[in-house]
Amino acid sequence: MAYGSVGLTTAGGALIVLFYLIMALTSLTREETRLAIERMAELHVPVPALVFWIGLALQFGGIALLLTGWHADVGVCLLIFATVTASAIFHRFWTMQDAFRRAVSRRMLLHNMAIVGGLLLLLQYVR
């Protein structure tokens, strides 16, 4: 399979990094931090505050490695791990009774699957 130019790959990688940067910075707001930790506690995640901060550290670490190009492949893997883990925690749509919440959660899981797909494509270029 032939892939696009280096410019397209760079643009795609930049959009992925921008997405994660915006999400991570948003998670640092007091309200978002509180909501995420409370939701994890409701979902019976052990030590939810610690899990939250580890997840955020993985995101910022992955972003930094991609931006600097130093072990960028490890950075992509950190973002994949963080995304899959967050999806497993927050988007268990099959357990939800409310039809609207179930539909939204299913879509979010599918969005995250697509993002992981983009990260896997990016991984081949940063190795």
Protein language model regions, located:
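Short amphipathic alpha-helical coupling elements at transmembrane boundaries
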Residues: 38-42
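Extended, low-polarity transmembrane helix blocks
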Residues: 1-35, 46-61, 67-127
